[in-house]
Swiss-Prot record:
GO terms for molecular function: protein homodimerization activity; RNA binding; tRNA (5-carboxymethylaminomethyluridine(34)-2'-O)-methyltransferase activity; tRNA (cytidine(34)-2'-O)-methyltransferase activity. NCBIfam families: PRK10358.1 (NF007683), tRNA_yibK_trmL (TIGR00185). Methylates the ribose at the nucleotide 34 wobble position in the two leucyl isoacceptors tRNA(Leu)(CmAA) and tRNA(Leu)(cmnm5UmAA). Catalyzes the methyl transfer from S-adenosyl-L-methionine to the 2'-OH of the wobble nucleotide. Recognition of the target requires a pyridine at position 34 and N(6)-(isopentenyl)-2-methylthioadenosine at position 37. One of its GO terms (cellular component) is cytoplasm. Keywords: Cytoplasm, Methyltransferase, S-adenosyl-L-methionine, Transferase, tRNA processing. The lineage of its organism: Bacteria, Pseudomonadati, Pseudomonadota, Gammaproteobacteria, Enterobacterales. This is tRNA (cytidine(34)-2'-O)-methyltransferase. Its main location: cytoplasm.
Length: 157
């Protein structure tokens, strides 16, 4: 199983959409607090529809608590400052894919602690600053899931 990590998410509908995505793919979701909204925010519930009960969500008090609880063996950070494209990574079961807050991305303290090959990016045309968080998560999730052969999915010939 793969893991999505949202570092201090700010916009409830994005997190709700990602909850729904995790329910549909079997990925686990980790949220590193503080969040920019309350967990019972109606916009979060609306975007996630009734998928909350089908998603494994773990909330962590802060980044240190996340590291202590999960001890990720392979942690990839999505950043516009990354070099390898998300599709150049050979994903493995158990990987963690971390995304920063919508308005500022991941802090330098986290990025600087990772090797260059674990700071990955989604290719974009020149002069594009960033993608919407839930869209970016979807792009990476489906590439990783595809590489692993869509475990748990119902595939039709």
């Amino acid at each position: 199983m793969l893991n999505i990590v949202l570092y201090e998410p700010e916009i409830p509908p994005n997190t709700g959409n990602i909850i729904r995505l995790c329910a549909n793919t079997g990925f686990r979701l980790h949220i590193i607090e503080p969040m920019g909204f309350a967990w019972d925010d109606k916009r979060l519930r609306r975007a996630g529809l009734d998928y909350h009960e089908f998603t494994a969500v773990t909330r962590h008090h802060d980044y240190r608590a996340f590291l202590e609880a999960e001890n990720p063996q392979r942690l990839f950070a999505l950043t516009t400052k990354g070099t390898p494209a998300h599709s150049a990574v050979s994903y493995q079961d158990g990987d963690y894919l971390m995304f920063g807050p919508e308005t500022r991305g991941l802090p330098a303290s986290i990025l600087d602690a990772l090797p260059a090959e674990q700071k990955i990016r989604i290719p974009m045309v020149p002069d594009s600053r960033s993608m919407n968080l839930s869209n970016a998560v979807s792009v990476v999730v489906y590439e990783a899931w595809r590489q692993l052969g869509y475990p748990g999915a119902v595939l039709r010939d």
